[in-house]
Design a protein with these regions (language model features):
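Conserved beta-ketoacyl condensing-enzyme motif
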Residues: 1, 97-111
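A glycine- and small-aliphatic-rich helix-loop capping segment at beta-alpha/alpha-beta transitions
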Residues: 1-12, 73-77, 114-126, 210-212
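Conserved beta-strand-centric core segments of catalytic alpha/beta enzyme folds
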Residues: 1-44, 146-212
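Glycine-rich beta-alpha junction loops
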Residues: 6, 34, 43-44, 58-64, ...
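Condensing-enzyme catalytic core mediating Claisen C-C bond formation in acyl metabolism
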Residues: 13-92, 99-100
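Beta-strand segments within the central parallel beta-sheet cores of soluble alpha/beta enzyme folds
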Residues: 51-59, 95-103, 130-136, 164-172
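Short glycine/threonine-rich loop-to-helix capping motif typified by GTGT followed
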Residues: 66-78, 106-123, 142-149, 179-182
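Stable alpha-helical structural segments in soluble proteins, enriched in small hydrophobic residues
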Residues: 81-92, 118, 122, 154, ...
Length: 212
């Protein structure tokens, strides 16, 4: 199915096939994995002395139904999902230098450029101040598991104050010109982490997590 959609990378280099935000990208790489999170209200978690990794302060969910595989070119719907998550959590007051975004970042020619546009629509001139990375550069695209595992990556980034990189980013595309944490993890004292999932058919979801 994905091969017939021309969505998969045709690279013969297994360690350099997943290339989010790189001008050499030609499709995503399939991955495998699983992740489980427990979402619990604050009062019961505190009462039972649960380990709380972060507070989920907002979410956004939109669907543009633009095309079965092609994302909406103007990024209106995908940007609105991020805005919804930010607005619900009153997160626009957080300085952009304290924000990390785990991008959907599939490494397909179209997705990465349009997701970059979505970030610019939401954050405007501050878009270049965010930390952004695609962990799919390391894990591949785990399909149904991708969102859960990338949310976990956000939680660990908040806890450890270490941001995962976008590996293989050697020739950054001019259409993906934000700071994408290239190649090496970095230390950053972030307050907010956003997890983006932008699926086929125009299904867009964003989660906003705040450090506690």
């Amino acid at each position: 199915g994905f091969a017939n959609c021309n969505a998969l990378s045709l690279s013969t280099e297994p360690l350099e096939s997943s290339l989010p935000f790189d001008r050499r990208r030609d499709g995503f790489v399939m991955g495998e994995g699983a992740g489980v999170l427990v979402l619990e209200n604050w009062e019961t978690a505190v009462t039972r002395k649960a380990t709380i990794y972060a507070e989920m302060i907002g979410y956004g969910n939109t669907c543009d139904a633009y095309h079965v595989t092609f994302p909406q070119p103007d990024a209106v719907s995908s940007s609105r999902a991020v805005e919804q998550a930010m607005e619900e959590g009153d997160a626009f007051k957080i300085p952009p230098e304290q924000v990390y975004m785990n991008a959907h970042g599939t490494g397909t020619p179209v997705n990465d450029a349009i997701e970059t546009l979505a970030v610019k629509r939401v954050f405007g001139r501050n878009a270049h101040k965010l930390y952004i990375s695609s962990t799919k550069s390391m894990t591949g695209h785990m399909l149904g598991a991708a969102g859960a595992i990338e949310a976990i990556a956000c939680l660990m980034a908040l806890q450890e104050k270490i941001l995962p990189p976008t590996i293989n980013l050697q020739e950054q595309d001019e259409a993906c010109d934000l700071f994408c944490v290239p190649n090496q993890a970095i230390a950053a004292d972030i307050t907010l982490a956003i997890s983006n999932s932008l699926g086929f058919g125009g299904h867009n979801a964003s989660l906003a997590f705040r450090r506690i």
